[in-house]
UniProtKB/Swiss-Prot annotation:
A biological process term (GO) from this entry: double-strand break repair via homologous recombination
Keyword line: ATP-binding, DNA damage, DNA repair, DNA-binding, Exonuclease, Helicase, Hydrolase, Isomerase, Nuclease, Nucleotide-binding
Top-level taxonomy: Bacteria, Bacillati, Bacillota, Bacilli, Lactobacillales
Binding positions for ATP per the UniProt entry: 48-55
EC number: 3.1.-.-, 5.6.2.4
One GO term describing the cellular component: DNA helicase complex
InterPro entries for the chain: AddA, DNA_helicase_UvrD-like_C, DNA_helicase_UvrD/REP, P-loop_NTPase, PDDEXK-like_dom_sf, PDDEXK_AddAB-type, Restrct_endonuc-II-like, UvrD-like_ATP-bd
The protein, known as: ATP-dependent helicase/nuclease subunit A
Domain of life of the source: Bacteria
């Protein structure tokens, strides 16, 4: 392929697909993968199912673009995480190295080497990273300094938010006409007497608005849309009415099926219909009649009447009991009727809430503006601010927008299903309208809590499917990860569960997983999926297993441990090939306890934010609080009770009785002082042993308090560690490595706190307490994870990963639906819906009542609530899909249930091969969904076995123990012929030693060397030429230097050298380099201010302005290559073995007939000849590498010396 070769036509792609299909390759690309790699000329959406090779497609597409002459820095490539970007860059780099090694075309080699250099500057990363870069370069359009910082600490954000909220709140309260505002605050305060509840409402609205493309526009134009639109029965959307009618029919269907069950008494012994059956038949008839003829009987205007009649028709309870089992037949319908039943009254009072919402709208806008102003003053912003700045710049500056659109050949985005509207707007502005390449899978959109909107993907999917002229839709269905047992059960579950109404996409042939290779299609019956249910029937009442909470039980974990032991012992499955997936990071202690009991190594994925709540850190924080203020009773007692001093409850009680007066309450420290002086009320309670401990404690605390006045926090913390051996003590406790890492991090964080300009123990404690007040924490310190252990991680964390065996735990846990009861519910299209507290006193006509407050769900709230409910259930469905598709070989679903109840479960209604919508909406756990599917479609093979596990199956004998196959049993030693074996071993070792000696030089020869390592090899040769080489080891003359008490950090020469090289690399090359260009490049250098101050900018300016080499670089900057990596094969003279020399060349100019090589040096020197001699061999090596690469014999070599008193450019080949 030539680098100027055009892109493939559809006909050429078709031929390539046919050739690939007929080829004898072991791993063939699918036709859809080929289409995704080579299609061009229009927007492309790739719907890539789990394990379909989307990363492979992206890498191959990028490489194809590069090979066709599109430089990698002309591609915009967005990834969801920094880690994904790093992995993508590594794959591209590997592909480029392979291409360089395989080609013999020198021109192509040079071009691909250029691409390797350009890769580090290419826009491959997260949207946040790109937005920062754009605002850094063009923030001047909005008046933003390029030296802004990102507020990444949530605690810092919350502290600033609280301060801004307080100021805005006081402004609104101080207004003369504040009646509506006070009523607004009271509406959300409930029983609280402060403004905290209202502040939470404002926070949630602000956060939601930030995910939109234009927050201020959304707040001004959309925020009140629903409140102004839905004010009467006629405004109720058709889909809401349709959902109610469908629920009525579904309830009638379920009731009809229930009356046909064995055990339901339809007739009496006399043969007459039972009263219950007659009543149920009437219900069935009425439900069918009213639903079928809704328009003629009621219509929207009489919806309230229908709700009243349904309430009268249905029983008060939701269940019907048949043969001792309860069936919640009426639950779904009754839940829907709650809002409709009183809708007429709600609509009458709802209009009162609109003035309050207008005040709320104004307040949130004021808060948003004030919060942004506060951040502008600090020149510190959140990620969302930077993204909005980037959008604003591109919208306000057409020249900048057009420059980006003209620069990018293609705008590529990975994990497109997890984009929010802010990110989508930024991508639209960067694209020219027909050069977008989007890869994702709506079935794996699980980040709604980050305001991701899967409908962005879904709308494009539908548009491109219906209108190919708008863009190309490519489906990647083949899965190359999982065996057929995993694929089959996944398809069986989701084809009966997921559709457009719930799941937001229909799981049909377009989305079902297909095995991508013949090996995957081979059947392994032992890997058939299993639903393992711990039977709660046998659990004793009051025990954990009998509880109805959502926590995982010890029984569930024990059955998992039993299966893992079986896999390890019998199938030789390594622990690291097994992963446990849970829904959240917390409340997993039972898993660790049970696994520890059976000796199964387990490692949890990091990321928990409970650092400040770890025991060892809490002890240290209470110690610091006590040093700061001994009158803090809680902290002081906690310190005394801690392992550092080990006062027990009895001793603390004796001290607490030592008040000097019963009239005035005293702090515990005062009682401690009274105890020491013998002046308490009961001095006889303080024995000699306790007195000794008190004296030791008091002396130590006083010593620490005095030390804290004169020393840093870092030194104080380490003094506490050393004085009481606390750092050593935690090393003997469980999770010792983590505990010590946490304590060490506390000292480091305290030091960073003081380094940032804040001083003093009091301020540090205040900062920590503010973090805890805002319900925030700091991330746990990461420690090295054991390699051979079972993994425990959340489903969210597992996305994109794959494991041989997957256990999805707590399968019966109910979905978190708390958001459906929140005071407000926000919708991107309809705005806000609220619970309004209305005074309904006049409805009762009781003059004795001052007021009667009733909280009612307004119609916009109810509509937003229904949409949120569907969105939440849809995301849970996708979460299950992600979890199941992580497995390569086998998936286990683990929960708990009553065997008796499950076996008596009847089939749910189904429609078009799926569970009925009402059933799917009613069921609120993964387990409920799956059991409904198995009951409803029991006659079909669902590729999963349901198995109950009793306590009798989980005894210590039944579970078993891990067997180690590596231990040598004593019985195996009796026939051991030691003398003969040892002699044979010694003989073998002797032969190996002789062989090693004969090839000693080759063994010691490194495979890869750097030029600086080679320089030491040349030193003996340089010595023979009259150059003195200092004998090793070199001993410096002893001298006494005064200690440096300054706070300035020492700047190492190596730091200056590295920063200079980075500066010379960052200077934008042009025909005329100005001082401004150099100053701008200096700002981009990633070094401390102290290091930058040591850079001699005058010499850099003089280099380009006065030297011939500097002028040559500017004149021919198109031929300039900087920071160029190279590799050359050399032969060792002693061993005659080959080795690779690798390095980085500062720069060179490439002409047709010559190469101009140069290198910057910051070494101190007296005579330039010293450095010429020192670096001659290194430069010769660079020249040899360039000459071999380009086939050009003439290479001019220059050293640019910046370490002397004057700038000097010397040529080495003269």
């Amino acid at each position: 392929m030539r680098i100027d070769e055009g892109f493939l036509t559809p006909e050429a792609i078709a031929r390539l697909q046919q050739e690939e299909a007929l080829s004898d390759k072991r791993h063939k690309r699918t036709a859809q993968q080929i289409e995704a790699i080579y299609s061009s000329g229009q927007n492309i959406l790739v719907s890539a199912s789990a394990g379909s090779g989307k990363t492979f497609v992206m890498v191959e597409r990028i490489l194809d673009k590069i090979l066709r002459g599109i430089s990698v820095d002309r591609l915009f490539i967005s990834t969801f995480t920094v880690k994904a970007a790093t992995e993508l860059i590594e794959r591209i780099e590997k592909k480029l190295h392979t291409a360089i090694a395989e080609t013999q075309d020198y021109q192509l080699k040079a071009y691909l080497n250029d691409q390797l250099q350009a890769l580090s500057q290419a826009d491959i990363g997260t949207m946040d990273a790109f937005a920062q870069k754009l605002v850094h370069q063009h923030g001047y359009v909005l008046g933003i300094s390029p030296h802004f910082r990102i507020i990444q600490d949530k605690a810092e954000q919350d502290i600033l938010k609280r301060e801004v909220f307080r100021q805005v709140f006081e402004d609104y309260m101080s207004q003369t006409d504040n009646k509506a505002f006070i009523q607004l605050v009271q509406n959300f305060s409930g029983r609280r007497k402060d403004s905290s509840a209202f502040r939470e409402i404002v926070d949630s609205i602000y956060a939601f608005s930030q995910s939109t493309a234009n927050p201020s526009s959304w707040l001004a134009e959309v925020f009140l849309r629903g409140a102004k639109t839905y004010t009467s029965f006629a405004d109720i959307p058709d889909q809401v009415v349709d959902a109610l009618l469908a629920c009525m029919q579904d309830t009638a269907d379920q009731l009809r099926d229930l009356t046909d069950m064995e055990g339901y008494a339809q007739t009496t012994k006399a043969g007459k219909l039972t009263a219950k059956y007659t009543k149920h038949l009437k219900m069935i008839d009425n439900l069918y009649e009213w639903a079928s003829h809704f328009d003629s009987l009621y219509g929207k205007e009489r919806l309230g009447q229908l709700a009243q009649e349904l309430t009268a028709l249905l029983p008060s309870g939701a269940d019907i009991t048949v043969a001792g089992h309860k069936y919640p037949i009426f639950k779904s319908l009754q839940e829907q009727l709650v809002g409709f039943r009183h809708l007429e009254t709600i609509l009458a009072y709802q209009q009162e809430s609109l003035p309050l919402l207008e005040v709320l709208q104004a307040f949130v806008i004021s808060f948003s503006e004030a919060y942004l102003a506060a951040k502008m003053q600090e020149n510190a912003f959140e990620f969302s601010d930077i993204a909005h700045f980037a959008i604003e710049i591109l919208q306000q500056a057409p020249d900048i927008r057009q420059a980006y659109q003209g620069h990018y050949h293609e705008v590529m985005v990975d994990e497109y299903q997890d984009n929010n509207h802010m990110q989508e707007r930024l991508l639209e502005l960067l694209s020219n309208g027909h050069n977008r390449f989007m890869v994702g899978d709506i079935k794996q959109s699980i980040y709604r809590f980050r305001q991701a909107d899967p409908q962005i993907f879904n709308q494009k999917f539908k548009d491109y499917q219906s209108n190919p002229e708008h863009g190309k839709l490519i489906l990647l269905k083949e899965n190359f990860r999982s065996q057929s047992e995993v694929l089959n059960v996944t398809n069986a579950v989701f084809s009966r569960l997921m559709d457009e109404s719930l799941g937001e996409i229909t799981y049909d042939d377009k989305h079902q997983l297909v095995a991508g290779s013949e090996a995957q299609k081979q059947l392994h019956p032992e890997n058939r999926a299993q639903l393992l249910l711990y039977n709660t029937d046998q659990a004793q009442e009051g025990t954990e297993e009998a509880s109805t909470n959502d926590g995982i039980s010890a029984g569930e974990v024990t059955l998992v441990a039993k299966e893992i032991i079986r896999l390890y012992n019998e199938e030789k499955v390594a622990f690291e090939d097994i992963t446990l997936l849970v829904s959240s990071r917390t409340r997993n202690d039972t898993i660790f306890q049970v696994f520890n009991q059976y000796g199964i190594p387990l490692v949890a994925d990091g990321g928990q934010e409970n650092y400040l709540k770890s025991v060892e850190v809490m002890v240290m924080l209470d110690t610091l609080r006590s040093i700061n203020n001994p009158l803090n009773d809680y902290a002081l007692v906690a310190l005394m009770r801690s392992p550092m001093f080990s006062f027990d409850e009895d001793q603390l009680a004796r001290i607490s009785l030592q008040s000097s007066s019963q009239d005035q309450p005293q702090a515990f420290y005062d009682k401690l002082s009274n105890s020491l002086r013998g002046q308490g009320e009961h001095p006889g309670l303080i024995g000699q042993e306790l007195m000794t401990k008190l004296v030791d404690f008091d002396r130590t605390l006083r010593d620490w308090r005095q030390f804290a006045k004169l020393h840093s926090l870092y030194e104080l913390i380490w003094k506490i560690f050393n004085d009481r051996f606390y750092f050593d003590f935690v090393a003997s406790q469980p999770k010792a490595e983590q505990a010590q890492a946490n304590l060490y991090a506390l000292a480091i964080r305290a030091d960073q706190f003081e380094q940032s300009g804040y001083k003093g123990l009091s301020r540090f404690i205040g900062m920590i307490d503010k973090v805890l007040e805002t319900q925030n924490d700091l991330a746990d310190v990461e420690v090295e994870r054991p390699k051979h252990a079972v993994n425990l991680m959340t489903i969210h964390k597992s996305k994109g990963l794959e494991f041989h065996y997957v256990f999805i735990l707590n399968f019966d846990k109910r979905f978190a639906m708390a958001d459906l009861q929140a005071p407000i519910i926000l919708n991107r299209d309809e705005g806000i819906g609220i619970k309004y507290v209305a005074n309904v006193k006049e409805l009762l006509r009781d003059e004795k009542l001052a007021s009667l407050k009733v909280t009612m769900e307004t119609l916009p709230y109810q509509l937003n609530k229904q949409q949120l409910r569907l969105a939440t259930l849809s995301e849970q469905m996708r979460l299950l899909y992600v979890a199941m598709t992580r497995a390569e070989k086998k998936v286990y679903l683990v929960g708990k249930a009553s065997k008796e109840k499950i076996q008596a479960k009847t089939a749910d209604n189904s429609s078009e091969g799926r569970l009925a919508l009402a059933s799917r909406e009613r069921l609120l756990s993964f387990q409920d969904w799956l059991l409904a599917i198995t009951a409803t479609f029991s006659k079909e093979d669902l590729f999963i076995d349901v198995r109950f596990v009793d306590d009798s199956d989980l005894t210590a004998e039944a579970v078993g123990q891990l067997r180690s196959s590596g231990l040598l049993q004593a019985d195996d030693l009796k026939d051991n012929r030691q003398t003969e074996d040892i002699a044979r071993a010694l003989d073998m070792l002797d032969k190996v030693s002789k062989l090693n000696a004969s090839y000693q030089a080759a063994i010691e020869l490194p495979t890869v060397r750097t030029p600086s390592q080679l320089k030491t090899l040349y030193e003996p040769l340089m010595d023979t030429d009259g150059v003195d080489i200092i004998d090793q080891p070199y001993h410096r003359p002893k001298s006494f230097e005064l200690p440096d008490f300054s706070k300035k950090k020492a700047v190492e020469p190596s730091q200056v050298g590295s920063s200079l090289h980075e500066l010379m690399q960052r200077i934008p090359m042009s025909d005329q380099i100005t001082a401004g260009d150099i100053e701008q490049a200096l700002q981009l250098v990633s070094a401390d201010a102290e290091v930058k101050a040591r850079l001699d900018i005058k010499k850099v300016t003089a280099f380009f302005a006065t030297t011939e080499l500097g002028k040559l670089l500017q004149e021919h900057h198109q031929r300039l290559y900087r920071e160029a990596p190279f590799a050359i094969l050399k032969k060792d003279s002693l061993s005659q073995e080959q080795y690779v020399v690798r390095g980085i060349i500062d720069g060179y100019l490439l002409f047709e007939d010559r190469i101009v090589l140069f290198d910057y040096k910051t070494d101190r020197y007296q005579q330039s000849a010293e450095l010429k001699q020192r670096y001659q061999q290194q430069m010769d090596l660079y020249a040899e590498a360039l000459s071999q690469s380009y086939g050009i014999a003439r290479v001019e070599k220059y050293l640019v010396l910046m370490g002397g008193s004057q700038l000097e450019v010397v040529r080495l080949d003269e």
